[in-house]
Design a protein with these regions (language model features):
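Intracellular loop-helix junctions on the cytosolic face of multi-pass helical membrane proteins
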Residues: 1-8, 12, 16-177, 181-186, ...
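Helix-loop junctions at membrane interfaces in 12-TM secondary transporters
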Residues: 1-7, 15, 236-249, 255-265
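Small-residue hotspots at the loop-to-helix junctions and early N-terminal turns
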Residues: 40, 187-195, 290
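Residue-level signature of mid-helix packing/kink "hotspots" within the transmembrane helices
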Residues: 47, 51, 198-206, 261, ...
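Transmembrane alpha-helical segments of major facilitator superfamily
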Residues: 110, 192-201, 296, 342
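Structural signature of the two symmetry-related core transmembrane helices
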Residues: 219-234
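A late C-terminal transmembrane helix in Major Facilitator Superfamily
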Residues: 280-313
Length: 389
């Protein structure tokens, strides 16, 4: 209960940081190209930060890893539980203290990085407030703004497609370590395989930024996210092979980069479209971003629930050196069949997303014309007022 309460508080505080941090994209520039570039830089650094955090956590906590439990076929579930208790008693006095200290040190290091990055963000980033031409005299209430946002068709289609593709990659991410350890038999290699995925994602985000600029965002979504499908199928169809696994890891990282970058890059276009349809509504950018963050947290929880229940029903044995065949089949489904189905469903929903490159250019021109018209009107009013004085 203590852990649950403090973990919920931690997630709440992280969300309170993540929502305004993400929404800052709309306030650092009015140019779509500059916002896309800022999003690419942000996602590159986020993925790089994930790699750094994984490396720090792994190096500190990895030294306190407890051994696996041998579970031969004749060992019953009760005997297996007894074996776990015996090993726990044998290693309890030393391993528990070492593990606690390792996690405390890792938490201190990561917490310090959180504070440092938050200070740099607060001090180093300046907002560009929207000029008066797109602002009404009285702001629209939060609840009316929420209703307008949730009735905006382009936003609903985008977050729905984002929901399914995010769930696919979170299932892959959450179960890939177990898949490498038990199904493929690469117990000593899975950390390097995960590192290959994240490094591949980090290095290919600039490529996807160029690709979406050259060919459009919807095309980039289809090419980028769907590119993982054949490799996810190959990794479970072919026999266990370390080289093929690394190739799949690199390919998955390329697709993960697209899944990280593209939905966040498309969101400012939706907000511009919303502004044109509802010029009287202002200051609701945080609503768009907060529901994006909400769906990220939601898919993370759903992914964890699906994985935990599926593995429990299959007979997963905690800390076992090997697993029943049912667990291996379940892991294959969780890292291949289910993600592929979710990706295809998400891409189908992205097909319904109405803002293509032509529509995006039209919105950009309309917003620019609106600003120029308002600026001209403001200058005329100022000149008239000066003449009167």
């Amino acid at each position: 209960m203590w852990y649950l309460i403090f973990y919920c508080i931690f997630q709440t505080l992280v969300t309170c940081f993540h929502v305004p941090y993400s929404a800052l994209t709309m306030f650092i520039s009015r140019e779509q190209s500059e916002r896309d570039s800022a999003t690419a830089y942000r996602m590159t650094v986020e993925v790089l930060g994930t790699v750094l955090g994984t490396a720090i956590q792994g190096q500190i906590v990895g030294k306190a890893v407890t051994p696996c439990i041998e579970n031969p076929p004749f060992l019953s579930e009760n005997n297996f539980s007894a074996a776990i208790r015996n090993v726990n008693m044998t290693h309890y006095s030393g391993s528990l203290a070492d593990t606690r200290n390792a996690y405390m040190v890792a938490a201190g290091v990561i917490g310090g990085l959180y504070i440092l990055c938050a200070v740099i963000l607060s001090v180093g980033v300046r907002e560009k407030r929207e000029s008066s031409e797109l602002q009404s005299d009285e702001p629209v209430s939060f609840f009316r703004g929420l209703k307008l946002v949730m009735n905006h068709g382009a936003y609903i289609k985008l977050i729905t497609g984002f929901l399914f593709t995010s769930l696919a990659f979170m299932l892959l991410e959450g179960n890939f370590a177990l898949f490498c350890t038990y199904t493929l038999g690469f117990r000593n290699e899975f950390q390097n395989i995960l590192l290959a995925i994240m490094l591949s994602a980090t290095l290919t985000i600039p490529f996807w930024q160029w690709f979406l600029t050259r060919f459009g965002k919807k095309t980039a979504v289809y090419v980028g996210i769907s590119s993982a499908v054949p490799f996810l199928i190959v990794v479970v169809v072919l026999d266990s092979n370390l080289v093929i696994t690394y190739i799949v890891a690199v390919a998955a990282g390329i697709s993960v980069a697209a899944a990280f970058l593209l939905p966040w890059s498309m969101l400012p276009d939706v907000i511009d479209d919303f502004r044109l349809q509802h010029p009287e509504s202002r200051g609701h950018e945080a609503i768009f971003f907060s529901f994006y963050v909400f769906f990220t947290k939601f898919t993370s929880g759903v992914s964890l629930g699906i994985s935990t229940l599926s593995l429990d029903f299959a007979g997963y044995q905690t800390r076992g050196c090997s697993q029943p065949s049912e667990v291996n089949v379940t892991l294959k489904l969780l890292v291949s069949a289910v993600p592929v189905g979710l990706i295809l469903l998400g891409l189908l929903l992205f097909k319904l997303y109405p803002i293509d490159e032509e529509k995006r250019r039209e919105n950009k021109k309309a917003l620019q014309d609106l600003r120029e018209e308002s600026n001209s009107s403001s200058e005329s009013d100022s000149t008239e007022l000066a003449n009167i004085v």
